[in-house]
């Protein structure tokens, strides 16, 4: 993977301050996905593939910060936003990239072999917080 090119592709999503829709780890850590807002019709999905390491720290440990489960929140209550995605050559294995990600109250480090970026239709999406939204 060309790290500089992938960083440019990420930057072209204009992620700065974009609300985060979801973050999840699947397949025993092999895939990690971050989904964030683009506009009212589309969103971005960034999938980290063949992950060798996934570490993250949440805001649950912050003193007097939150005492509720994130899964019970509505979209407008989430409060996570994309601040920075930094891609670096992984020092211990040149076939991997180290991804340092700041999502406000969530700091993530992922070591993976590939990154897929998708621009998807919001109308087709399923997010955990949609179950908490009220129908008006």
Segments predicted by a language model, with ranges:
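Surface-exposed, interaction-prone regions used to assemble/regulate multi-protein complexes
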Residues: 1-136
């Amino acid at each position: 993977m060309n790290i500089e090119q992938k960083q440019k592709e990420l930057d072209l999503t204009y992620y700065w301050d974009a609300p985060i829709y979801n973050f999840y780890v699947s397949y025993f850590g092999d895939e990690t996905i971050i989904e964030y807002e683009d506009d009212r019709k589309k969103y971005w999905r960034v999938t980290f593939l063949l992950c060798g390491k996934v570490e993250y720290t949440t805001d649950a440990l912050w003193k007097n910060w939150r005492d509720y489960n994130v899964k019970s929140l509505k979209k407008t209550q989430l409060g996570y936003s994309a601040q920075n995605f930094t891609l670096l050559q992984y020092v211990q294995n040149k076939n991997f990239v180290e991804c340092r990600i700041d999502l406000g109250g969530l700091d993530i480090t992922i070591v993976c072999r590939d990154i897929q970026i998708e621009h998807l239709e919001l109308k087709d999406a399923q997010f955990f917080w949609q179950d908490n939204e009220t129908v008006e």
